[in-house]
């Protein structure tokens, strides 16, 4: 899906890691929430509350989920799942355009 219709968008950006990750929250009519964002080249660790699906629209990254020693590479058109109440390490080598689906 290249477009989300009938949504509410929070104008104020979510800024993380000194601006290395910037996103906007989008809420759908049914209450579902997603964030649309960009991560600039960096090595970061994110913590999750709810389970997440990270959909990659552009860019390249390597990801290591909590409890794993294995790094996996993801690019445009791919996605990875992160359990709730967990974390993941991400190394972005090409600016990453993503959609984060919660729940």
Swiss-Prot record:
It comes from the Bacteria. GO terms for cellular component: cytosol. It is an enzyme of class 2 (transferase). Its EC number is 2.4.2.1, 2.4.2.2. The keyword Cytoplasm does not apply. Keywords: Glycosyltransferase, Transferase. The keyword Glycosyltransferase applies. It catalyses: a purine D-ribonucleoside + phosphate = a purine nucleobase + alpha-D-ribose 1-phosphate; adenosine + phosphate = alpha-D-ribose 1-phosphate + adenine; cytidine + phosphate = cytosine + alpha-D-ribose 1-phosphate; guanosine + phosphate = alpha-D-ribose 1-phosphate + guanine. GO terms for molecular function: guanosine phosphorylase activity; purine-nucleoside phosphorylase activity; thymidine phosphorylase activity; uridine phosphorylase activity. Transmembrane segments: none annotated. Disulfide bonds: none annotated. InterPro entries: Ppnp, RmlC-like_jellyroll, RmlC_Cupin_sf. Belongs to the nucleoside phosphorylase PpnP family. Catalyzes the phosphorolysis of diverse nucleosides, yielding D-ribose 1-phosphate and the respective free bases. Can use uridine, adenosine, guanosine, cytidine, thymidine, inosine and xanthosine as substrates. Also catalyzes the reverse reactions. This is Pyrimidine/purine nucleoside phosphorylase.
């Amino acid at each position: 899906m290249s477009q989300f219709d009938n949504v509410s968008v929070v104008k104020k950006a979510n800024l993380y890691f000194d601006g290395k990750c910037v996103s906007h929250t989008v809420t759908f009519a049914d209450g579902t929430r997603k964030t649309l964002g960009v991560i600039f080249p960096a090595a970061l660790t994110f913590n999750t509350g709810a389970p997440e699906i990270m959909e990659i629209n552009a860019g390249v990254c390597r990801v290591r989920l909590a409890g794993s020693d294995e790094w996996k590479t993801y690019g445009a058109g791919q996605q990875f799942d992160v359990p709730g109440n967990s974390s993941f390490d991400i190394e972005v080598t090409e600016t990453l355009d993503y959609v984060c689906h919660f729940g």
